[in-house]
Every structure is written in C-alpha cells, then in structure tokens.
C-alpha cells in the first residue's frame, strides 16, 4: 500500500511517542470505492475505527452487483444491485472536498430499496466528510421525478456527516428509522421529498438546493418520525435556494407516516415557499410542523402567518392541529443541539484541526510545528493531496516537479482534513 495506508486500525507513534492514525484504505491507490467499503465490512475488529480516504476525482461506481429482486410495473425482476452497502460500524469515509470528490451511481430502476449510491445498514458511528454522493438515475437529467436514493440509512446511531453533498431528485436522502444523525455544512439537492424517513436528524448550517422540476412545486421533506421521539427533523441556520421557478411554489414538507416532526430554525429562504408552507400526504397528521425566525433573501423575517394548520386524517376528516406553526423563543431554545443530543455532542466531534505555518529548507524539506490535535498530516502539491505523514516534516522526493507549491492539511480523529496551510514554493530560491 502507498500514500500511508495501513492494516485496519493501525497506530503509529510519532517522534514524541504520541499515537497517530493512518488511513486504512486509499481510493484509488489501494482499490475502488466499492472495494474500500468491502474491506471495511470484512475487517476482523470492528470496534476500532477504519478510515477510508478518497482522492479527488469523479468515480462512477456499479455497486456490489449482487442479484436482488424488485417489483416494477406489477412484475418481479431480478437485477444486478447498483448499491454499495456499508454494514460495519466505526467507519470513516473522507475525501479531498465535496466539490472535487464525487461518488456517482447510475441505477436503471427506481425505488428506495434498489438505488442507494451508499447504503448505511446498521453502520453505527459512520463519519463522512468532504465528498459528494450522486444517484444519477439512468444518466438522464430530464428524469426530475425519479425515485433514486443517494444516501440511505437504516438502523444506525451516531452518524456524523461534514461537508457532504447529496444529489438526486426524489428520495435523495432516506433517513434513519430509529437512529440519530448529525449533518454540518452539508448540501442536499433534489425535487420531491428529497429528505425523507425517520429518526432524529439535525441539519446544522446545511444548504438545501431545489432542483428544476418542470415548473412544478418541490417538497423538501417527508418525515416519518416515530411516535415516541421528541425530535424529528431539525433544520438549524440552513439556507434554501435553487431553481428560480420554485419561488412561491415549493413546500417545506408533508407528513408521510407515523408522527412526523420538522422544524426550521433561523433558515434563510432565498426562495420563499408557498404561503401555506406545508402540504398533505396519505391522511397522516403531523405531530409538529413549525418554524422560528425564517428569513427572506433580504434577511428580513419571512411571512409565516398563513402556514397550514389543518390536515385531513386517514378518514378524510379535517383536523385543526394544536401546535404553533411559529415557535416562541422559549420553544425554539428546546432545539438547541445540546438539548437534542445532551450526551453526544457531535458538533465537537466534527471539529476541524487548524493548520500549522509551513516553512521550507534549501534542501527541499518542508517542515512545521507539530500540531498535537492532528492525527495525520496530508501533504498537498498545488492543492492536491500527494502524500501523508505522521511527522512534522516532509522531504520532497528527488525528481519532483519544480516551481510548485506545497501546503499541509491536518486530519482530525475521524480522518477529516481541515483547511490548507500557507503555501511554500519548491524549490526554495
């Protein structure tokens, strides 16, 4: 293995005897993305974290290829699965950036159970950072209502996603029944119900992109929150933007199943939704659909006085919901992340490690002060990762390109890379 990949869970003492962690699998150096997930699933000790690094590129994956049976147009079909399934806990998947590291699948059949670019199945404590997952149905950009999942979670707890982009049309992100997930600085793109499912899911500073839907109004979320949960979907300090045709047409959400909950807190709505805000679905009554300090594109309070409070139940009887469609300040404070996750604190786990100041010697060695919080250093040449080291220096190999810049990025415990350091030019003249 190269680029400092190592056996699963390997630890390397640095020059001061501190434990540093290596990446266990580097894509594509050590194999494909599908091979990396397979290696994580089949490692003997799943109690230790397994770190996958994905170098910047666009990867079109075919999935595991196992035969699965689906129902289409009333008929059963056996197809080759386009899904890649992670079943092991304690796995990190980290790229170089969500704008330049893309994992794309191309499912040929619609549906939640046969399209997931990445399916997290019982994969507790998964950490994903700095990449994009795209479910590109039939490679057909006109299929704006296709039901194709980019990320699917099932029976997972404690997942953290940082700088992750998810793109599809309908069902882009199918969330975690019975689970908990934290998203920070992520982007979710879609058309209909493109955030749907159960669990307690906290979207912190995320961007929600409304994709073009042939002039029809989009619906952002369709929660299926379990009845015993105090929290469902929490959108905090997010931004809604996208196709200009969605102005005044789209809906924030609709109640799919169970006891749906969704709140939008301090959300910038660059495109305003339909004045009703919420719509109906299948006779399900929401447990709570509400907002607090929604903002328009001029950062003024958005109009919310006409938000829907009446929904039809399964018997087609109109019910006036008893909750407030606009939260009081005291009610909104209950959705502080420390109240939603009082013992977990995922925002601390996703913290990035600040870079050091990098210098270069006449000999061609670059060096920096050691960063105690860093579990690994990524060496960048012209901003692309070319090597890793656990020591606070890097000797540029002989024969390397001339007149190029080098910088350093530090990895946190989970393997996510922080910002780049200052750049130095090789050779030093």
Report each predicted region and the residues it spans.
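Bacterial Sec-dependent N-terminal signal peptides
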Residues: 1-12
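Sequence-level preference for short, compositionally simple segments enriched
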Residues: 12-381, 385-429
